[in-house]
Every structure is written in structure tokens, then in C-alpha cells.
Amino acid sequence: MVYIMEIYTDGGCRGNGRPGAIGAAAAVVVKRNGKSTSWTRSLPRYPPPTNQRAEITAICLALELALEKFDQLDTNPQFDVTIYSDSKYAIGCMTTWIYKWARNGWFNAAGNQIANRDLIQEASDLDDRLDEVGNVKYVWIPREKNEVADRLCNEDMDDQ
């Protein structure tokens, strides 16, 4: 049996990278019947939130939710998880660059330590765990296809 999950993610930041910045991440699980369940997470104040940190945090949140769902199931189905993001950075991190960075000791082609290494490594570890029970696919979508997750991020930041 295959258990399918589709998760839409988004991250946002106000005051990107500056002192006093606020950020949030959201993940929206869309069920087969069209209904959805959503979660948000406020970013910590340190390191200062950025849009990129928010987008990777959203990926981590989605991976955590998928693993949590797998642990709740009575059976051990093959998991098929698709994570959607409107961030080309987040999708690139999870599909291409992460493998090169890991091989290069977390340095980029210019020899600089990669930004957001802590979150990217966390996402990589969660991805590895999910790969043990199924497949994870990362898909870029245009912003207008991600309105619910975007709205949830903004609501979270409004409440901070």
C-alpha cells in the first residue's frame, strides 16, 4: 500500500536579516478529499531571520509532519511525499546543492562556508529519515499556487 502526502510550504520574513526581523514558516497538508490541515512556526530571533531561513524552516516543518504521520499509522506503507515550494532556493538546496555541499565539507564553489548550514543539515537529516520509509519529491510552484501557505506565514508574523 502507498500512502500519499502533498505538503505546500512557504516561509517569509519582515526586516530580512536585520536586527528585529521576524519570520515564519508554514506547511499545509492537502488531503485526498481536498481538505487541508496547516501548521506554522515562528522563527527564532537569533540568528536573525531571513527569507531563506524561513523557506528552509518550512521544508523542515513539512518533513517533520510527514515523519510524524508515518509514526501514527498502524501499518508501514510505502510513503510517497511531495513537498511544494515557491522558493527556488529551497528546492535547489534539497534537490541539487545539498549533495555538492556535503561532499565539499559544507563549502560552496567559491570556498565559502554555506549560509544556513544548520537548517540545511537539519533538513538533510529529516530527508534521509523519510527516505528510509518512502520517497520524497520537491517541486517548485509559482507563488500564486501557494496562497494558503503564504497567508498563514503572514498571519503568524502579524501575531509576533
Give residue ranges: language-model regions.
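RNase H-like nuclease fold core
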Residues: M1-R53, E64-D71, D156-D159
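RNase H catalytic domain
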Residues: N16, L61-C153
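Short, conserved alpha-helix that lines the donor NDP-sugar binding/gating region
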Residues: E55, I59
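Short secondary-structure junctions and interdomain/linker hinges
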Residues: L130, D159-Q160
